[in-house]
Amino acid sequence: MTRGERVIAFIERFCIVPEGKLIGQPMRLDPFQKDFILAVYDNPAGTDMAILSIARKNGKTGLIAGILLAHLVGPEAVQNTQIVSGALSREQAAIVFNLAVKMVNLNPKLQEIVHITPSGKKLIGLPCNVEYKALSAEGKTTHGLSPILAILDETGQVRGPQDDFIDAITTAQGAHENPLLIVISTQAANDADLLSIWIDDAVKSKDPHIVCHVYEAPKDADISKRESWLAANPALGTFRSEKDMARQAEKAGRMPSFENTFRNLNLNQRVSTVSPFISRSVWELCGEMPINTPRKWYAGLDLSARNDLTALVIAGEADDGVWDVFPFFWTPQKTLEERTKTDRAPYDVWVREGLLRTTPGASVDYSFVVADIAEIIGDFDLTSMAFDRWRIDQFRKDADAIGLSLPLVEFGQGFKDMGPAVDTLESLMLNGRVRHGMHPVLTMCAVNAVVVKDAAGNRKLDKSKATGRIDGMVAMTMSVGAANGEVTEQGGDFDDFIFRPLSM
C-alpha cells in the first residue's frame, strides 16, 4: 500500500461516523476526499502545503478529524511530535476537537490508545506520544508550538493578506524537516484575502510541493442548475443534502440580497457577501494600462483623515473615448506596519514597489503630499482638481507655502454631487471605457467600495459600510465628476452634513 492508501485505510477502518443519519457506521470517504489524500501523501515531490477548497456542508470537519487521528495514532504518527488544528473562533476550533473526541469514543480500540483532556482541547496519542491541540485565534496558546502537522479550518474567513494567528502556526513548523500544512476551507470573498492569495500562488507557481484542489462553480453559473451545485459540492447527494441545496438556491433566486452569500458559501465562488459598487469582472475588463497623451485632465483629491490613505486620481478622456486613470497614494510612515496588520492590506509591500508613497510621522503630512503633487502634475494639463472641503485648509496653506497654484474646485460628498458622478463612472466602467492598469492600491479600494441610496435613488460611496479603504475610488469618482462639471457651490450640499461622518 502507498502512504496515501494507508491513511485512507486507517480512516475507513477505525473512524466511526459520530453524528447524522449514518451515526455508528464506519466512515466511508467520498472519491474527492480520497483523491485529495492520495495527492497529498503520495506526491513524488513531497507535500509542504495542501489546500482543499469546497462549499459548505461537504464533510470538511470529518475529513480534518480523520486526518489528524491518522497522525495521532495511525500510520502518520511520528514519535514525540505535536499536531494542531487552527480556527479563527473558539467555537469553530471546538467543533473539530469535539468531532475527533466522538470518533475516539465510538471505537474501543482508539479509546485504549488516546488520552483526552477536554479542558485543554488536547488529545495524546499514547503509542508514539503525539500531542494534538485545537487552537483558536481568540486563545493565547499559539506561541511555543512546533507542530509537524497543522490543519487550518476555514481560512477563507480571514480578511486581507495576513493574519497573526496563522503566521504564528505556520512559522512554528520551521523546526521540522518535512512539516505539512493542510488548509480546508470555503473560498474567501475577495482576491486580496489570504486564502485567495495562497490558491492563486499555487495555480500560478505550479510548485510541485503544493497540492491545491478547488471545487467551485463557474463565475457565470446559473444558481438554479444542479451542475452549478455539483461543481462546488462534490459530496452532493451523499452527505451534502440536495434538498437543502435546492432550498438555498430558491431563496437566493427570490432574494437578490442573499445571492452573493449563496454564491460564496454554496457555490464556493469568490463573491463578497456585501454587494460591491463595481464587480470584479467589470473592474478587470477595464484593466489595460493607461496612456498619457496630451488632453484635458481632471483630478479628484481625497485627503481623508490624516492617519489614513490620501488619494489623488487623475483621469482624462482619450480620442478613442476611453478614460485613462492615473492614481497616486500617500500614507504615514510611522504607523505603516501597524496599519498593514489592522487594515489587512500589504501597504509595506506597496511602498517597496513604489505604488504607495509615505510621509514622515504618524499622520499624513500634507506638505510632502503637496510637494509630490507639484511634481506629478507636470506630466498633465490639469483643468480642475475636485476636493472635499472638510480637510482642505491645511492643504491650501502647504500649497501656498511653496507657491503651488492648483485649479481646486469644491466637490460635495453628499448624494447631490456624488450621485451623478457615481452614475457616470459606473456607466464608463460597464461599457469598458476606462483604463486603470489594475493598480493594486486602487484595485483594493474598488473591491471594498459599496454605495448607499437615498429615498430618491441617488447613490454615493459610503466609507462607513465599506469592507476596507475606498479612498482611491472616492478620488476617482470625484475626478470623473469634475470633468462633467458636477461641483458644489461654496455652501455645500445639505447631504454632506446629514450623511457624512465628521471623521474617518
From Swiss-Prot:
Inhibited by zinc. Keywords: ATP-binding, Endonuclease, Hydrolase, Magnesium, Metal-binding, Nuclease, Nucleotide-binding, Viral genome packaging, Viral release from host cell. Its cofactor is Mg(2+); Mn(2+). It is an enzyme of class 3 (hydrolase). Mg(2+) binds at D471. A motif (Walker A motif) lies at residues 54-61. Homopentamer; forms a ring-like structure through which genomic DNA is translocated into the capsid. Interacts with the terminase small subunit; the active complex is composed of a pentamer ring of terminase large subunits and a nonamer ring of terminase small subunits. Interacts with the portal protein; this interaction allows the packaging of viral DNA. This is Terminase, large subunit. It comes from Enterobacteria phage HK97.
